[in-house]
Design a protein with these regions (language model features):
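RNA pseudouridine synthases
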Residues: 1-222
Length: 222
């Protein structure tokens, strides 16, 4: 875990691939507990430390996660995420080059909870939810392409599912059609940047994640 930004009300950390944001049935220690311990030790706080989980990243994804350190910040950030006032930018290394260097993708996504997987359709189907994202090619090597992705909606596995539907699965993402896994079990999707108005001070906050420690990321990033 790396702290990217911190003040009295919020803390933004860079999550490593493989970490879970919040506790689940695996029993593995979540990032939220690691951050609580960091706050407890840094500020010598006795007893329980307040930390609000505002959003999540899939376990194999790396990058920025925003937490609230006060109940006031938690309430306001929850509303801001719900209302699309937190602008998140993702970087994805994908197989193949998209047909268009820049485009908006619109699909209808159906989530299969038993498989923990989503399926994208070009038209509305039963139990589907509309999913929209924008992408832009910002780098490439001989075999891979780096896309900058902005979500217009927030669906289950949306980026992974929609890019795979386009014929450009994320490197290492076996679930969505990548031919091989990454050696460390990650998928090459990074929550790269967040920008929002601070819920208390009203200042504009911009944070960027460090690149994963990987030769391909270093070679392909602009």
């Amino acid at each position: 875990m790396q702290v990217v930004y911190e003040d009295n009300h919020i803390i933004i950390v860079s999550k490593r691939s493989g970490e879970i944001v919040q506790g689940d049935k695996t029993g593995d220690e979540p990032l939220s507990e690691t951050v609580k311990q960091y706050i407890k030790e840094k500020y010598h706080k006795p007893g329980n430390v307040f930390l609000g989980v505002v959003h999540r990243l899939d376990r194999p994804v790396s990058g920025l996660v925003v937490f609230a350190k006060t109940s006031k910040a938690l309430s306001r950030l929850n509303n801001m995420f719900r209302d699309g006032e937190v602008h998140k930018t993702y970087w994805a290394i994908v197989k193949n080059m998209p047909m268009e260097p820049e485009a908006t993708l619109t699909h209808w996504i159906v989530r299969n909870e038993k498989q923990n997987k989503s399926y994208a359709y070009d038209h509305e189907v039963k139990n589907s939810k509309k999913a929209i994202l924008k992408y832009k090619v910002i780098g490439h090597t001989d075999h891979y392409t780096l896309l900058e992705v902005n979500l217009m909606t927030g669906r289950h596995h949306q980026i992974r599912c929609q890019l795979a539907k386009m014929g450009c699965p994320i490197k290492g993402d076996l679930k969505y059609g990548s031919p091989r896994s990454n050696a460390d079990g990650s998928i090459s999707l990074l929550s790269h940047r967040v920008e929002f108005v601070h819920p208390v001070s009203k200042e504009t906050i911009v944070a960027e994640a460090p690149l994963p420690d990987d030769n391909l990321w270093r070679a392909i990033a602009p």
